[in-house]
Amino acid sequence: MRLLIAAMSGIACSVLFNPAMGSESCASRSDAMALKTAAVQQQLMVAAFMCHDTNAYNLFVHTYQTDLQESDASLKSYFVHRLGRRGQAAYDTYKTKVANLAGLSQARNDKAFCGAANRLFAEALESPASLSSFVEDAPSPPGFRNVCVNVPTEVRSRMRLHIAQARSSGSR
């Protein structure tokens, strides 16, 4: 089972980071947010069916309908921009693979999966003001953990400085 899950994760990541996708090797922050939003939505959709809680999913979709539609349009644009005519197929494949990975996660531990899904639904509906803040704070769904995000140079420099300071203060 672990081998199957690892293979599925690899397939999902290869859809995202195929060298043929162009010179940009990483997603922008907004593209990464669209990728993660789709992954979280697919995870919640699978959870709704597997855990028999379609009402929670329907409320989630209704609450964030406009944001979800905008994010989905951005996701399609991401794939079309990178892959041209093959973009729509890659978009469909990505969403299918993410849903399949969520289903595999559920198959490994039904009780834990449904408990985590219930907590995720509660968090999503607790503060409906911002889908993006919910998605940012949500745990990364299976298959999403290896997404590479372009970080501006000045942010990278500040991150390196912060890490160096943390290391030096920890070694005292």
Show the residue positions of the predicted features.
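Bacterial N-terminal signal peptides that target proteins for export
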Residues: M1-M8
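Short, intrinsically disordered, charge-biased short linear motifs at domain edges
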Residues: C13-V15, K36-T37, S132-A138
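N-terminal signal peptide c-region/cleavage motif recognized by signal peptidases
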Residues: F17-P19
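Immediate post-signal-peptide N-terminus of mature secreted/exported proteins
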Residues: S23-L59
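Compact alpha-helical subdomains of small soluble proteins
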Residues: Y64-R172
